[in-house]
């Protein structure tokens, strides 16, 4: 609910989604604690329960990399966008690069047992997107759906404070698509 709460505080009408009920409950609690008007619903990003041409903007953060069918998600996101609407997708090649990262004490997964990390790595390799070159893949796909796309590969340092970079050491990028 990070972006959802910020955007609602700026006066926007916001609907945040996640496929995980616990994440939605946590987002609702956080929104309530800060007086946010953001709404939240359990929903699959690859199969949205919204009408066509509903939204002006879709903002996603750290989502696309772990979807089984990211191409379907992009198609759905464009479907629910109004003409001239925008997708802002902040993501990184986590699935592709995570298994190469040093497991130092400053890593996001420092408290996870090695056996569970190995299972995660196996799943990462099964994800379609782990075999692509991103964000180039995203750009080509969205352009094939007739969106106008720009990529910002320098967005990471503007989002993460220096002391937080250890937490997610894979460079973040922004995929901006206009319908």
Regions found by a protein language model. Give the residues of each.
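C-terminal lobe and adjacent flexible extensions of AdoMet/dcAdoMet transferase-like proteins
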Residues: 145, 171-179
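A short SAM/SAH-binding and catalytic strip from SAM-dependent methyltransferases
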Residues: 56-70
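A short glycine-rich, Lys/Arg-flanked "PGG" loop and its adjoining helix->strand segment in the class I
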Residues: 71-86
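Class I SAM-dependent methyltransferase SAM/SAH-binding core
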Residues: 1-47
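A short hydrophobic/small-residue beta-strand
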Residues: 14, 87-88
